[in-house]
């Protein structure tokens, strides 16, 4: 795992400060034991605690995105469980990313995934479907 916060939160992998400990969907829901959908509804309703957690999450995600952009200089597609909820927050996230990126003046390289759920399963299925079609 990539370290986001040296000496930070303990990650399930055993290390401390991994990006996963700060940017996984569980960061948003573990304390309240609610679903991600319930959490995002609270954010929409401007629930104080949910908004605070969301802003911290977006800040950590922005740092991670900026680091990845600096390292790889390529488009970044945001997926996973949270990716399906990011479309309405891309302007805010893009602005946060720009705070950490002194070399670029826009975040057009930042994209939201097309598949809102189970994107990896769709990708695997697509691979085998294409292979099958070639045999016809």
Language-model regions, residue ranges each:
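ATP-binding/phosphotransfer module of carbohydrate and carboxylate kinases, centering on a glycine-rich
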Residues: 8-10, 15, 19-136
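Short, intrinsically disordered, charge-biased short linear motifs at domain edges
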Residues: 1-4
């Amino acid at each position: 795992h990539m370290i986001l916060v040296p000496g930070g939160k303990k990650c399930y992998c055993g290390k401390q400060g991994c990006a996963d400990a700060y940017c996984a969907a569980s960061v948003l829901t573990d304390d309240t034991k609610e679903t991600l959908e319930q959490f995002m509804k609270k954010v929409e309703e401007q629930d104080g605690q949910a908004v605070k957690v969301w802003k911290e999450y977006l800040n950590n995600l922005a740092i991670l995105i900026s680091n990845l952009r600096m390292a790889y200089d390529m488009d970044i597609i945001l997926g996973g469980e949270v990716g399906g909820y990011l479309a309405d927050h891309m302007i805010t996230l893009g602005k946060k990313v720009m705070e950490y990126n002194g070399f670029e003046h826009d975040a057009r390289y930042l994209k939201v995934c097309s598949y809102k759920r189970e994107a990896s399963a769709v990708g695997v299925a697509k691979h085998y479907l294409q292979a099958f079609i070639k045999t016809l």
